[in-house]
Amino acid sequence: MKKSLSAILLLALLPVQAAFAEPRSEVVRVDVPDNKTAQNGLPAVMQRELERAMALVHNHQTAEAMPLLNRLVGQADAELRRHKNVRAAGNRVHTLRLLLEAANSGRDTEVVSSEWLMPRYVRAFARVEQKNYAAAAAELDAVLAVASYEPQFLAERGQVANAMKDFAAAERTFKRLHESAKTLPDPAQAAFYQGAALRGLGYGAVERGQWQAAEQYYRQALQLNPNDRAAQNELQFVRQHRR
């Protein structure tokens, strides 16, 4: 099955993310499970340009990528403004959840594909590459204001918070990710993002000297995936420091 645009971008940008998110661990390339329920909302021309921008970011050419990303973000934002009280989702479960919330609040809401937020998401990666974590956080906060349950956005926001040493914000975000991931319709996606949340929580616990909590998080990650090398490495690190 053809991978969604989100999965393609995540695969290419993982090394960029890993460079700042897990400084003690060996960089582990992970095959992000395909989101079988995601819809490709972006027009083909925008998809091609976004993939080109992503390739530039991957090759550390953020200065060259930024003009292209700025244009794509502008185009995507213009599309989002066409919709009333717009929200975004990447699967049917999250779409229904957003519509139910809107119905309960008495607000008319239009839910579009989360693909429309990918240009800003990739621009956040570019900010990370530039070590401009505050700008990356602002980009991701804007994304999450529209797509509050999408796991890739929550995961990156938590990583940025950890990089900024805002561990309270990181903890809140990763706990949101952990809960959101449980609702994903694809079991591989659900396990992958729950593991990412637990590793993010473990990292923050280590940085705050909460060794027991960190060990528990990494153990939970390994219960989900015994072959999670990043969790294995971090658990070994924690055990060495608890002796």
Feature names for model-found ranges:
Residues T62-A63, Y133, F167, W211:
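TPR-repeat structural position
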Residues V45, W116, Y149-E150, L184, ...:
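Residue-level recognition of tetratricopeptide repeat
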